[in-house]
């Protein structure tokens, strides 16, 4: 890899927010053609070595138009009935973002905030070593002008209670325009989201499984950019998937990435909504290169696998455990067969799955 032109480091808002800030920066560097460089993890922060972005184009960027449309509708619709407000003309990346949120009541504010932060990004951009301390980011009783709430999908800390002087208070986690804009871009362009409606017997609401790739070792920006091709939203039927099962599902139905030969991990977190309650649970890190290689092998030997995966439920959890940690290949096949049988699915293609699992194991 080439010598580092400039070292930019994420501020330290937690591994979720920092991973998204890294991906937002990589997206911008890709647009500017500044992909000669690398990223690496340092604790829960990430270092990106590349030319500093100039951001002269950002006011004219196409996503800004989509954000403008959404913001204009909000302004015009203030006096409409609430049921009409729910049918906003969100499309493209804004639609996917709206389906990924677990806080729909604040979504229009998120859109307005990210639009404002993107306009400010050119003048505000700063990813220096002491960024967080210099900017005074973090918990605050009240937000300062030019600062933004780090909404729940972008972090695991939004809405938690803080103990202070033997009392308990709930305060927002405030960040600057750089952190807010880049983390939102990272969530849009660097994250696979899977929305699952929860059964009414479980209280209703929905979960969103979030998956992004992070470097386990020094990794080229081109490799991380290639993995961003998988980003987007998938809708899943109600089921009993855990984090690994959801990872297998998202990698199975999405684009197949063969080319990554560097050490990457998968960061997974789950955002949940039930009634007015929302939270982040299940933050995990899995070995990404192993899982990517395994799913690519399965798709190669069983071309119908994406269709099969869409029919499966809890057997994806069993498969995920096997792919991540090893185990009994026959137990996996039996579990998949039983799952398909319960759903009336066809068993064609399972021979290829068995061959792939034996090769992987």
UniProtKB/Swiss-Prot annotation:
InterPro entries linked: CRISPR-assoc_prot_MJ0385 (IPR010184)
**Quick one: a GO biological-process term for this protein?**
defense response to virus
Entry keyword annotation includes Cell cycle: no
| Induction or repression | Repressed by 5 J/m2 ultraviolet light and 50 mM NaCl, slightly induced by 20 J/m2 ultraviolet light, 100 and 150 mM Nacl. Member of the csa5-cas7-cas5a-cas3-cas3'-cas8a2 operon.
Ordered alphabetically, the record's keywords are: Antiviral defense
Provide the assembly information. Monomer. Can form a Cascade complex with Csa5, Cas7, Cas5a, Cas3 and Cas3'.
- What does this protein's UniProt record list under function? CRISPR (clustered regularly interspaced short palindromic repeat) is an adaptive immune system that provides protection against mobile genetic elements (viruses, transposable elements and conjugative plasmids). CRISPR clusters contain sequences complementary to antecedent mobile elements and target invading nucleic acids. CRISPR clusters are transcribed and processed into CRISPR RNA (crRNA).
Name by which UniProt lists this protein: CRISPR system associated protein Cas8
Gene designation: cas8a2
